Design a protein with these regions (language model features):
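Short acidic/glycine-rich loops and adjacent helix/strand connectors
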Residues: 1-163
Length: 163
């Protein structure tokens, strides 16, 4: 069945609603970034930000020309890795939307989602990939539709180091 999968990203400082068709077409996303006054991310404050911006982001999504709630066939959400309080907000919003729309709820690994979007957009077929994003730096192998982490940083991810 062709339709749209609504994705919810809430692993850390960004809260987003994104869309992808069941045929792989990407649509513009709607995001809000938590910016602490100083220092790094404060997980509870970031989660509060996500809760406070949910309505605004959903309104922006609803008002976009190419969007219809009737086209949603599933709701996907980042279930980890990420910051616990932030992940809980995303999961709660996803469960609510899934229930209201009577569509399946799909928990997604945040790292795998990054990789799969990249593979979808580039046609990459390489069996071994280097994944670098925020707090995650991993060497990952893909075989038979599954991923296996071959190695990863133990102290700090390259993305965090660069931040």
């Amino acid at each position: 069945m062709e339709g749209i999968i609504l994705g919810i990203e809430s692993t850390a400082h960004t809260f987003s609603f994104g869309r992808v068709s069941t045929t792989g077409e990407l649509f513009p996303s709607f995001s809000s970034l938590y910016r602490p006054e100083e220092g790094g991310i404060h997980p509870r404050e970031a989660a509060d930000h996500h809760s406070e911006t949910t309505s605004t982001l959903l309104e922006r999504l609803s008002d976009s020309e190419d969007f219809s709630w009737d086209s949603i066939v599933a709701v996907a959400f980042s279930q980890g890795p990420g910051l616990g309080p932030c992940l809980r907000v995303g999961a709660s919003v996803a469960r609510t939307l899934s229930t209201r729309l009577s569509v399946p709820l799909l928990g997604v690994n945040h790292c795998v989602a990054h990789i799969e979007v990249g593979r979808n957009q580039t046609g990459c077929k390489a069996p071994v990939l280097l994944y670098v994003s925020g707090g995650n730096t991993q060497v990952i192998a893909r075989a038979d539709g599954r991923y296996r982490v071959l190695g990863e940083t133990l102290d700090i991810g390259i993305g965090n180091m660069l931040d």
